[in-house]
Swiss-Prot record:
PANTHER family assigned: PROTEIN FAM166A (PTHR47299:SF1)
Oligomeric form and interacting partners: Microtubule inner protein component of sperm flagellar doublet microtubules.
Pfam family, any one: CMI2B-like
GO BP: flagellated sperm motility
Function per UniProt: Microtubule inner protein (MIP) part of the dynein-decorated doublet microtubules (DMTs) in flagellum axoneme. Binds to the intra-tubulin interfaces.
Protein's UniProt name: Ciliary microtubule inner protein 2A
Subcellular location: Cytoplasm, Cytoskeleton, Flagellum axoneme
Name of the gene encoding the protein in the UniProt record: CIMIP2A
Family: Belongs to the CIMIP2 family.
Keyword match Cytoplasm: yes
UniProt keywords, alphabetically: Cell projection, Cilium, Cytoplasm, Cytoskeleton, Flagellum
Major location (coarse): cytoplasm
Length: 320
């Protein structure tokens, strides 16, 4: 049983699908066929040299830097999360410094003394995740004595009336001192800020001494038009552009503000160029701006420019 015949409308096999934007040396001057038929002719023509690699296929096999086929090694956490400290570590150790800030009450002192003093925390097993020291330095136990030793007035309120009545320190029985961990955040003291806030430092655009200084800075390689610019031997491009822009600014200032005595007619430099206003009109397809021509309609380009020329003559006759 024979396979069904393919319609002539379809491109014969083998062929490339449209969308390839590469370079075909043989496709330069071929016209009249579709892309598929042309590529089919090139692929079946024995006189055309072909590469063993297809155009749409990658030229080389992609190289993978990382091998994903092997299993990954087990994750090893950082030593800081496992060990309490690192050998030879010389950085900050919180709760390192001790201070004698108060005494235990008598019953607690006896209990602490019977357990062995400083080795209490090492003998009592602590649950996992337990912080042996509070996150903030605790307040020492209050002492009924001089109110100046209590510090903040809130402590005096907490101790009651006896802290306010007696001013002489009360005699206390000798007992074991309680050790507290005091967190010391050692940092240099902040300098007194005396300067006022300078709002000008937050300006995004720089403060320029010359107006339009950003537009006057030319970039090397710029091929656009620079007025009054001329190539001078031995002068840098940026210096030449700066000098040309200075001359252009001066000429524009004199053009807008001509020098003439009071009562005299304005000089010829005040008027626009004579190439715009001519009696014979301008040629069509002129894309420049022609003053007093925007209100004209139902006229050709030549008649519109002639009418603009007449309006300009009338305006000059009414001006000094």
């Amino acid at each position: 049983m024979t396979a069904p015949q393919k319609h002539n409308l379809f491109s014969p096999e083998p062929h490339y699908i449209p969308g390839y934007a590469g370079f075909y040396p043989q496709l330069r001057y071929r016209v009249g066929d579709t892309y598929g038929r042309t590529t089919a002719q090139l692929l079946t023509d024995p006189s055309v040299q072909k590469s063993p690699c297809s155009v749409l296929a990658p030229v080389a096999k992609p190289k993978f830097i990382e091998d994903f086929s092997k299993p990954k090694p087990p994750f090893v956490p950082c030593r800081d999360l496992i060990e309490p400290y690192i050998p030879h570590y010389t950085g900050l150790k919180p709760y390192k410094n001790f201070e004698m800030l108060g005494r235990f009450p008598p019953q607690e002192a006896d209990a602490q003394g019977s357990l062995g003093g400083e080795n209490v925390s090492r003998q009592v097993p602590l649950p996992a995740g337990f912080m042996p020291y509070p996150p903030y330095a605790p307040c020492p136990p209050g002492r009924k004595g001089d109110s100046r030793d209590l510090g903040h007035p809130g402590l005096r309120l907490a101790l009651g009336e006896e802290a306010w009545k007696s001013t002489a320190p009360a005699c206390e029985a000798p007992g074991q001192y309680q050790l507290y961990h005091c967190r010391r955040d050692e940092s240099p003291p902040l300098a007194h800020w005396q300067e006022t806030l300078d709002v000008g430092r937050f300006h995004r655009l720089p403060q320029l001494g010359h107006p339009k200084l950003i537009q006057r800075k030319a970039i090397s390689g710029y091929a656009g038009f620079v007025p009054r610019f001329a190539w001078v031997m031995g002068m840098n491009y940026r210096d030449g552009v700066t000098q040309a822009m200075d001359e252009f600014d001066k000429s524009q200032f004199l053009l807008r503000n001509p020098i003439c005595a009071l009562g005299e007619r304005l000089p010829s430099t005040h008027w626009p160029s004579n190439t715009i206003y001519r009696s014979q009109g301008l040629i069509p397809f002129y894309m420049g701006f022609i003053p007093s021509m925007q209100d004209n309609y139902a006229l050709t380009f030549g008649n519109s420019t002639r009418k603009a020329y007449q309006k300009e003559l009338e305006r000059r006759s009414r001006t000094l």
